[in-house]
Amino acid sequence: MTIIFLICLDASTQSTTNNSINNNNNNNNNNNNNNNNNNNNNNNNNNNNNNNNNNNNNNSKVFDFNIF
């Protein structure tokens, strides 16, 4: 009876350990995905800002024409 109990206890412990590992892996994956999304958003924002700055620079150019 003791052997059966220990086997069941070991299986239960292993299952709990596996669940904990899976949860940690899922959390890590979620964190990585969030970081990737944040990086992508930051890159997009930077690109948009650069485009806006370029547009503003192009629009603000002054051309001097000397007429003789």
Curated annotation (Swiss-Prot):
Is the keyword GTP-binding assigned to this protein?
no
Keyword Glycoprotein carried by entry: yes
Q: Which superkingdom heads the taxonomic lineage of this protein's source? A: Eukaryota
Q: Which residues form the signal peptide?
A: 1-15
For bias type Low complexity, the affected ranges are: 22-59
Q: Where is this region: Disordered?
A: 14-68
Write out the GO cellular component annotations. extracellular region
Which residues carry attached sugars according to the database record? 18, 58
Q: Which UniProt keywords apply?
A: Glycoprotein, Secreted, Signal
Location(s), subcellular:
Secreted
Q: What is this protein called?
A: Putative uncharacterized protein DDB_G0277445
- The organism of origin for this protein: Dictyostelium discoideum
